Design a protein with these regions (language model features):
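Nucleotide/pyrophosphate-binding catalytic subdomain
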Residues: 2-319, 323-324, 493-495, 514, ...
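Structural motif
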Residues: 6-8, 40-44, 85, 191-193, ...
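Glycine-rich beta-alpha junction loops
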Residues: 49-50, 199, 283-285, 334, ...
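A conserved regulatory-domain signal marking ACT and ACT-like small-molecule sensing domains
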Residues: 345-552
Length: 552
């Protein structure tokens, strides 16, 4: 084995780690990487099994403030236990029991042993793990026990602080990796080490404005520390670790927020100076629009870091925008690949090559839903120094981040994505009170808004052609229009019920093959069009419909 391993980091999401078939694909991919040469090592970061994080969130709610008619925290806990049992059983981790039992009886007998080894007869009584259960599974069963005890503690105290919430939410990844390492060994990957991500990913507490930020939206700065990561790996060729979770400087568990597993994988890639970071999911990459609503959206084959970050921030859900920064920090290529089509098309994110000589290009039309818009009007604003500082001070004070901004002589309009506690929570109510009383402003609140964004490069160079997009908006109320300072997106805020239709019409304008042909005829020999540049077309792959119908 080489003394200087070359690392590849793979990240698999919840759907990719929830079935036996998907785990076989994961192990095949790992084996394929290992077969390249003796120096290649593989660092695997995985999420919780599908829906487990949602169940943990609901269990916290039901343990602290039960809602009548909803599953209890114990029922949700049992569902999580059985979900992991089903996977262990399907993979074949549980051997055949003696006694000539039918397959149904075998399953039921193992399920009973699994539950008894997790819960016992009394919530706080010591549990003896059934001796028939394989020893390799004992850490998983004990982790279930830890989760149950914490949920019972929440039930007794009737409260769950952000610190306790983070501890509970982290169990999804802790459980999936306990089971995952058993599956990998069972499927032939013997040289594998499970690593606790909390040993390596330590949050930057100085960035936290509140306990919610510190424990539930933790920030971990990218760094290179190959020696520490290799030490944690115990020099095994394969490492399995958790996405989403980390620790504070005093050793408490924290989580990186939803989508944090992408960021975890990127942080590990930077730490290891990996040669590549692969995000494995259930789609082929990033598309020119959300293919769930625009089936003829085309795959974007290549992006630079900033383009990918902007697409993710403005609505592309394939990856989290924060995951780009660590990869960019270490200049590591990122690939988005489909677990169901491992040798198929993909999106590659890499350093900018800027081969299009400064020409404008449109990359995608995307949207974000469930936004809140505030319009703040004050007639004493005009010409008043410090007015904007006064308006925005309460946002910082109550931990509410502003997304898009548009200003005039007498008003400021902003969009809000994440509001702690939602629009009915205390932070938002306090914000409105301060804006209306202390800033002497009239505040209008528009809920259920969507932001529709045209994402690209050097958009201002094609304002004349972009102006035709406004025809699509005729008859709709646009609450805000914003063009980014970096010239990367043009965004419109409107009521959510209209967003899907507008996105589809804008996408057709920019990416339809029929429209592109018409543009080529009408502009041939006179002008170029952002809808027919060769540099952009070379970046685009097949449509979603084509890829979905391709053989795997």
């Amino acid at each position: 084995m080489s003394s200087s391993p070359s690392w590849v980091v793979l990240k698999f999401g919840g759907t990719s780690v929830s079935t036996a078939a998907r785990w076989r694909c994961i192990c095949e991919q790992i084996a394929s990487h290992l077969a390249q040469d003796d120096a290649t090592h593989v660092w695997v970061t995985i999420s919780a099994m599908t829906q487990v994080t949602n169940k943990l969130t609901a269990a916290l709610q039901q343990a602290s403030r039960p809602v009548a008619g909803e599953p209890s925290h114990l029922e949700l806990f049992r569902s999580i236990v059985l979900q992991h049992f089903a996977l262990a059983y399907d993979v074949g981790l549980l051997p055949s029991l003696d006694g000539g039992l039918s397959s149904v009886d075998q399953h039921d007998r193992w399920q009973d042993k699994w539950l008894r080894s997790t819960l016992g007869d009394d919530g706080f009584a010591p549990v003896v793990i059934d001796a028939v259960l394989p020893t390799a599974l004992h850490p998983l069963l004990l982790e279930f026990r830890n989760l149950y005890r914490i949920l019972e503690g929440v039930k007794l105290t009737e409260e769950a602080s952000p610190r306790i919430q983070a501890r509970v939410l982290a169990f999804g990844e802790l459980l999936s990796t306990h089971l995952g390492v058993c599956i990998m060994q069972h499927l032939g990957l013997s040289d594998v080490q499970r690593v606790d991500a909390r040993q390596l990913l330590v949050s930057e507490s100085s960035a936290a404005k509140s306990d919610e930020d510190r424990f539930l939206q933790a920030e971990v700065l990218p760094r290179e520390d190959v020696a520490r990561a290799v030490e944690a790996s115990q020099r095994r060729r394969v490492v399995l670790t958790q996405g989403f979770i980390g620790s504070t400087k005093d050793g408490a568990t924290c989580v990186l927020g939803r989508g944090g597993s992408d960021t975890s994988g990127s942080l590990f890639a930077a730490m290891l100076r990996a040669k590549r970071y692969e995000i494995w999911t259930d789609v082929h990459g990033m598309f020119t629009s959300d293919p769930r609503y625009v089936p003829d959206a085309r795959l974007i084959k290549s992006l630079d870091y900033r383009e990918a970050q902007e697409l993710a921030a403005m609505g592309a859900k394939v990856l989290h925008p924060r995951c780009i920064e660590p990869a960019q920090f270490a200049q590591i290529p990122v690939e988005i690949r489909n677990t169901n089509d491992p040798n198929g098309e993909k999106t590659v994110i890499q350093p900018s090559r800027d081969q299009d000589s400064g020409s404008p290009k449109i990359l995608a039309v995307v949207r974000r839903a469930n936004m809140t818009t505030l319009s703040i009007t004050a007639f004493d604003m005009c010409g008043t120094s410090g007015f904007l500082a006064k308006v925005f001070a309460p946002f910082e004070r109550f931990g509410i981040s502003v997304d898009l901004i548009a200003t005039s002589q007498f008003s400021v309009t902003v969009t809000l994505d994440h509001i702690p506690g939602g629009v009915g929570g205390a932070p938002f109510k306090n914000l409105l009170r301060e804006l209306e009383h202390d800033a002497h402003s009239k505040v209008q609140v528009f809920e259920s808004c969507s932001v529709v964004s045209i994402v690209g490069r050097r958009l201002r160079k094609s304002l004349a052609e972009l102006g035709r997009v406004f025809d699509v908006l005729e008859g709709y109320d646009v609450l805000l229009l914003s063009e980014s300072a970096e010239d990367l997106n043009l965004s419109f805020v409107l009521q959510q019920k209209n967003a899907d239709e507008i996105v589809a019409r804008m996408h057709k304008y920019f990416f339809s093959a029929e429209d592109a042909t018409a543009v080529q005829r009408s502009t041939a020999g006179t002008t170029s069009s952002i809808r027919r540049t060769s540099s952009r077309d070379s970046l685009l792959g097949p449509t979603w419909q084509t890829l979905r119908g391709s053989p795997h």
